[in-house]
A protein has these predicted regions:
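Short pre-active-site segment immediately N-terminal to the catalytic Zn-binding motif
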Residues: 128-152, 165-170
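Active-site recognition of the HExxH zinc-binding catalytic motif
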Residues: 150-163, 178
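A metal-dependent hydrolase signature that marks the N-terminal structural subdomain at the beginning
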Residues: 1-121, 129, 133-141
Length: 200
């Protein structure tokens, strides 16, 4: 095999050592306001799958009655890699919906199921008790509906919480506010959702 000599040190030009790497900070939607909303679909990770497409997000946000107000300060919606204990997340300017497990049968703790029983019933998700929890059997369309109508709305609730505080730095009202926000808007857009995405 032929050996190639590579220069590993930077050049000297006009008596000045040149920088080896680009020192400029690369802007991203995490730290720089974007001219338009970015919908970023990342790899789901091993054992996970994205049931949402970018066009699903675009269609869904078109159903929200106050999107112009809600989208202020929102740079991106991320279809993020899956995590065992996380359905979604928010950080200033960005909300994420995590990929779903490839297995559509999900075990929930009884407390989690009780808190989401109305949403799951509306979506027609079948469930039965198991030891230490409840087994929920989703279909592809039910996963998509749950991620849009509950998880995304919940994370947008955190964003709305942050943007309606005086400082606009952090979401101060926490989980109860985001959960109530999701439940309120799910009821408002339920019929529009069914018209746009079809039945479950």
């Amino acid at each position: 095999m032929r050996q190639i000599n590579r220069q590993s040190t930077p050049k000297v030009t006009d008596g000045k050592v040149q920088k080896k790497n680009n020192p400029e900070w690369t802007a991203s939607y995490y730290d720089t306001p974007q001219p338009a909303l970015v919908i970023d679909r990342q790899r789901p990770g091993k054992g996970y799958r994205h049931f949402l497409l970018q066009r699903d997000i675009e269609t869904f946000i078109g159903l929200l009655p106050d999107w112009a107000e809600l989208s202020k300060g929102l740079n991106a919606i991320v279809l993020a890699p899956g995590e065992r204990t996380l359905n979604g997340w928010h950080t200033p300017g960005v909300v994420g919906v995590c990929a779903w497990e490839t297995d559509l049968w999900i075990d929930y703790a009884e407390s989690h199921f009780d808190n989401h029983q109305d949403v799951l019933a509306r979506l027609g998700v079948h469930s039965h008790p198991i030891e230490n929890g409840v087994m929920c059997r989703f279909t592809d369309t039910q996963v998509r509906a749950y991620q849009l109508l509950h998880i995304l709305l919940h994370e947008l609730g955190h964003h709305h919480d942050r943007m309606t505080t005086k400082s606009k730095v952090r979401a101060s009202r926490g989980e109860p506010y985001a959960e109530a926000y999701a439940l309120r808007y799910e009821a408002v857009i339920w019929e529009r959702y069914q018209e746009a995405f079809g039945g479950l």
